[in-house]
Amino acid sequence: MLLALVLSAKAQTPKHEVRAVWLTTIGGIDWPHSYSTTTQKAELISILDQLQQAGINTVLIQTRVRATTIFPTTTEPWDGCLTGHPGTSPGYDPLQMCIDECHRRGMECHAWIVTIPVGKWNGTGCKQLRQKYPTLIKKIGDEGYMNPEMPQTGDYLANFCAEVTRKYDVDGIHLDYIRYPETWKIKVTRQQGRQYITDIVTKINRAVKSLKPWIKLSCSPIGKYDDLSRYRSSGWNANTTVCQDAQGWLRDGLMDALFPMMYFQGNNFYPFAIDWHEHSYGRIVAPGLAVYMMHPREKNWDLDVITREMSVLRQIGLGCTFFRSKFFTDNTKGIYDFTRDFNIVPALIPPMTWTGKQAPSAVAQLKIKRSMTADNISWQKAVDYSDGDYLLYNVYASESLPVDINNPENLIAVRQRELSITVPHKGRTLHYAVTAMNRYGMESKPVETPAAGTLASSKPLNFQQMIIGNKLKKYKSKKK
């Protein structure tokens, strides 16, 4: 079975699929690479443009680094990656900028929260935190860690996540290192250890969902949940080694999504990927792939190690996540070029069907105005039957009726908030359909426009080339 999956042909592109990347800020290893505010902003925009053009629809940006942050707060100090001086403001809000720029490109932005590790014992973040809470931080070597066995740890992290949720229009809260550190000598039973970690997750879930229940709560567990009947985890797994019951969190509704760190290949990858799929309980799973392992300074993996994993994950209905951004955008061994072709057809984020939320009403008064070069489509807003704060709109185009909204090749604009769009038609007769989508990803029934007349025939349109998030590319070529 596994061999058949690996050798199978490229799976059909699904309409719903998570295509994610971890954007790492610690030490500026992915971003930023300069302490100049102007340069930082330009670099972030360039990175997000590259990700968008490769079909990425989810950005996990490292927001809490090591008891330090990339947003203004009195809770913890600024991380030093922004200015070179921990505790010093860069003069703007990087998290807000990333959210705005992701949304402008039709991508989700999740705040990546490093939970238990708080950095060097005498580092700015750890030092300030242990001055406030001297009994909460444990020293192991020269590193500090929040104590997962103390209830105050869950309270603190829940309050921190609530602050991010309250202040920012993030699409997700993504928990990292939500487990016992591998260097921690666990003295309680594994069952009790799992309960301690689950208690923290429960507190964070309640804090986030009470404010904005549409926000996806996720984590990045160890890549192997536990030993399988035929395949062993070699002593390094989530459930037993570090008391991280990630599959149980999906089952019990504490998590909406998992991004397992599956930095493996062969039989260390495929059986465990299937295990995550079989225990996803209808939630989102998008395994992390080790694109960094292709670098000659790492393990020098061949490109086809990653591309086969991508194909198999798509075939079994899982998304994928790249670790980490710079190795991806640097096109290590051609991974960026491959992914851009692999994701040529756009994808929406899977809807949160487990919430039971009702889809919005259809849009009203859909109109089309045609000029010699473009169609302008406009509509009136739909009615949101959920508790979300605003609606998003998806636009589909086809040269035939009815417009098939189940075919992702027809998607030309995703997750846009505006109530109109201009589409270059290249002289062809196009039909359009518009759907409303709530913050849970539930999509309304489509409303279609009739064709707006016919002009002289031109070569067939490639709708995928038109997409640029919730905007459309102009057909005039741009030289780089």
What does each of the following model-derived ranges do?
Residues 382-407:
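Solvent-exposed loop/turn segments flanking beta-strands in beta-repeat/beta-sandwich domains
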Residues 246-247, 251-269, 286-355:
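Substrate-binding cleft of secreted/luminal carbohydrate-active enzymes
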Residues 42-69, 167-171:
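Catalytic domains of carbohydrate-active enzymes, especially glycoside hydrolases
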Residues 335-388, 441-475:
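Pro/Thr/Ser/Gly-rich low-complexity, intrinsically disordered linker/stalk tracts
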